[in-house]
Amino acid sequence: MTLAVVTERTTGTEPNHMVEFREGLELLKNEYPDKAVLKLRQAFESDKRNPYYISFLGLSMARAEQNWEQALDLCETAVQLKRKEIKFHLNLIEVYALAGWREKALRKLDNASKLFGDDARLKRFRAKVVERRAPRSAFLWTQAFLKSRTRQIAAPPVEARRQMKS
């Protein structure tokens, strides 16, 4: 779907900030976070207390600018404003995952599971967070293994160390 089609669909009787928000969501969905940030920021500037604008602006900033601190602040604010909206929790969890804070993302998933029960979206997010984590732990295991082998090869025998001390 092109931006022209999205603009055509959303213009009409809706206020401009709602049009900007819908276009921003469409851009975010279609993997254009840089463009989405601009649209979502315009919507946010029109209504700074709208938790939907706040949450999705935070998510788009995380994806486009890797501005983790501000993205987390926005997403956490949206969750505080409307705690019962699962999408705000999912956006916050995604920002934690994008920032590389897997443990925090998993804790937030656990908390959201307590609040929303057995939701399929939470299960999908958990699978993504755990999946992203696997290569990292494999890398760390390999790194630790190589480091221990290097020490064994480089370290002088015990007898030689004793002689060096004397």
Which stretches of residues belong to each language-model region?
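Conserved structural position within tetratricopeptide repeats
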Residues: T11, Q42-E45, E76-Q80, D110-K114
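Canonical tetratricopeptide repeat
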Residues: F56-L57, N91, F125
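Alpha-helical segment of the N-proximal tetratricopeptide repeat
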Residues: T13-S46
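TPR-adjacent "capping" and linker segments in tetratricopeptide-repeat scaffold/adaptor proteins
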Residues: T2-V19, R136
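Structural signature of tandem alpha-helical TPR/SEL1-like repeats
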Residues: N30-K39, A64-T77, A99-N111, R136-W141
